[in-house]
Amino acid sequence: MQNLGFTEADWKLFRKRLPEWQERYMEGLVEEYKAFLSSEVPASTKFWELEKRLKNDRRKTGVLAEGISRSNMKFLMMDLINEGAIAEDDFDGFSDDFRDQLLFYYANVRKK
């Protein structure tokens, strides 16, 4: 079934991989937090900066994807690309048409 430029298999693969991508993305965030907390800045700066980062990061699709539906899948993928949660090699397994759309977005549109 073709729907909005992707197949049912693409939708199923997206739902399977999303938790894996989110876990990997959050592992990266935790490493960034650890590096920041190990820095030589005052404790109060660490506390307030970390609170600010956590508040911002928890809104990202790489942490919490809201509105997961077929009609939002492309937008969620674009968010994940823009956040750096996924890259080109994560497009493997998707249908050729959908993969081409993702590669075009990755190469030409994403926020760098």
Go through the PLM ranges and name each one.
Residues M1-K112:
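Acidic, Ser/Pro/Thr-rich low-complexity regulatory regions
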